[in-house]
Amino acid sequence: MPTHPRHFSITQIGNLASLRIGIKNASKEQSENVLEASALLSGAHIHHKIADNIIAAIWRKYILNCAYNITTARYNRTIGQLREDPETAAQYETLVRESWLVSEAAGAGVPETSINEIIDQFYHKLDPASTSSLQRDIWAGRPSELETFSGYLVRKAKELSVPVLLSETMYSDLQKIVSKQS
């Protein structure tokens, strides 16, 4: 047993992370609670926004993560390396589109314009040296969020009869990599 406590922290790299708060179909009391939470966050100087549609905000972030985490993990490359390769860049774009189609079928309300915004982030805003937590965990043989960023999407797509061929392929490929790393 260690003689000192372990300390953990999260380091934000880049400026694309943002905190959204809200409640789906909030009652008046729940809306007031969201405003109170917002005031607390503001008082602590934590930048955030109240989402008009929290489900759409969650799905939009999920769409980004499905492409970002899956492509970096599958190829064990940085964002810059993915951008430089026309094939992996095109796959990133396809994963964004497939994820959006699932969100649309699920009724999340993510605007279609988000597709190009997320793809634009990939080409112009993400740090070229960026890697993903999924990538680092898989290639280090640690437990990962593969089921969160790929398994769930593939299962939801099947449930909603949405074809996601590349997502299925990447999920299968990553499952094989994970089994070899174990």
List each language-model region with its residue ranges:
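NAD(P)-dependent Rossmann-like dehydrogenase/reductase catalytic/cofactor-binding core
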Residues: 93-182
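Active-site-proximal catalytic alpha-helix in oxidoreductases
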Residues: 55-83, 87-100, 126-127
